[in-house]
Amino acid sequence: MRKTSSPRIAPSEITPRDLYHDRRRFMQAAAGAAAAALWPHWLSAGEKLPGVRKTDHVLPDALTPFEDVAHYNNFYEFGTDKETPSRTAGSLKTRPWTVSVEGEVQKPKLFDVDDLLKLAPLEERIYRLRCVEGWSMVVPWVGFPLAELIKRVEPTGNAKFVEFITLYDPARMPGQKSSVLDWPYREALRLDEAMHPLTLLVFGLYGEVLPNQNGAPVRVVVPWKYGFKSAKSIVRIRFVEQQPVSTWTRAVPSEYGFYANVNPQVDHPRWSQAKERRLGEFFKRPTLMFNGYAEQVAHLYAGMDLKKFF
């Protein structure tokens, strides 16, 4: 994968999060193979994730403040407005938690989330996140490439797509008591999209364990697609031969296609995609093709009509 030449900006210079400036010193002390010994039985939201290493995946963009990232959320399982999830997601219990990896794989497995956390070295990736509603943020995610998990379960030749299924628990996810969507939430990627080095399996942000409202304890992040493609609070990962029908496509097929690549030239029926409002900014900015990751991912869609396959 080609790396961008974006200037490196120290996290301490671009974020107001008070505790964030200590992370570099912490990581240096905990890096490498010795990090495994630092893991407690489990970690709760707000605790530091040990052994997180930095990579070249940084941006010139300023980070969105932690308070905005944690309190401006689309997570319909906890409510349909942006502020409710941060107030109601405390009811979600993220331990014990398992993720079943199944379907067209040679080595299906039921992972305890704490074992999944230690499957590969954790790294920080600063990514843009673009919502189809026309707003965006910049988030320092913590996780590892989803490809690390995929390689270990060895997909068969029949595996063409990867489906992600969110927990269904109306008692703890009160939004699931409504009929606004067909629960549980489902999303999917082509196998090559899931294997792409930019696609992350995520366990934290800002160096800390994911807040519940941001998809704890494990989610995916696909930075060149609209945010609804990045499934949260995952309990099943299925490898299948036929293209799955995702939740939003099932709900409104004329508005939500399978691919959902960020594309300023293809508007949603309700929202222009030409510009976006970055949280914390007053003026809108032009939206970048593939959310600014065209150099890395455009080849995945060579020859495709992106207006037809939206």
Swiss-Prot record:
GO terms for molecular function: metal ion binding; molybdopterin cofactor binding; oxidoreductase activity, acting on a sulfur group of donors, quinone or similar compound as acceptor. Belongs to the MsrP family. Its main location: periplasm. It comes from Methylococcus capsulatus (strain ATCC 33009 / NCIMB 11132 / Bath). Keywords: Metal-binding, Molybdenum, Oxidoreductase, Periplasm, Signal. This is Protein-methionine-sulfoxide reductase catalytic subunit MsrP. NCBIfam families: PRK05363.1. Predicted to be exported by the Tat system. The position of the signal peptide cleavage has not been experimentally proven. It comes from the Bacteria. The keyword Transmembrane helix does not apply.
